[in-house]
């Protein structure tokens, strides 16, 4: 079994640009402050927020953007208008590394995902 490249969130952030690391940390902290029942886990070498064993929101970094996924095509579809400025796909949306997180949007996405899961709400 292969070992994780990033065993911790901090080790993941250490490989990012300062702007991307600051934005990633701000997004995760913003969600966890509003939803303390969620836990941060590294899975597939990227940070994921979980409710029990269910994935609620995932984050990843690329060279020119950060990606955020609520783990649900239905949630993405329901928020299509609000996500339009953020290069959405069926599964995720992209933000610039220096993005100032939209707390209301992140909270609403998580809330919708939790309703969909029927737990941790």
Language model regions located:
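Charge-dense, helix-prone N-terminal extensions
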Residues: 1-121
């Amino acid at each position: 079994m292969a070992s994780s490249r990033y065993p911790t969130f901090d080790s993941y952030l250490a490989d990012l640009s300062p702007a991307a690391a600051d934005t990633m940390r701000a997004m995760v902290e913003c969600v966890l402050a509003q939803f303390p029942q969620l836990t941060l886990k590294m899975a597939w070498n990227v940070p994921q927020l979980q409710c029990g064993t269910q994935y609620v929101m995932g984050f990843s970094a690329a060279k020119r953007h950060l990606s955020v996924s609520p783990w649900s095509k239905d949630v993405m579809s329901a928020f299509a208008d609000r996500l339009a400025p953020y290069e959405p796909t069926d599964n995720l949306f992209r933000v610039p590394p220096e993005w100032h997180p939209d707390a209301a949007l992140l909270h609403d996405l998580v809330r919708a995902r939790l309703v969909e899961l029927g737990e941790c709400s």
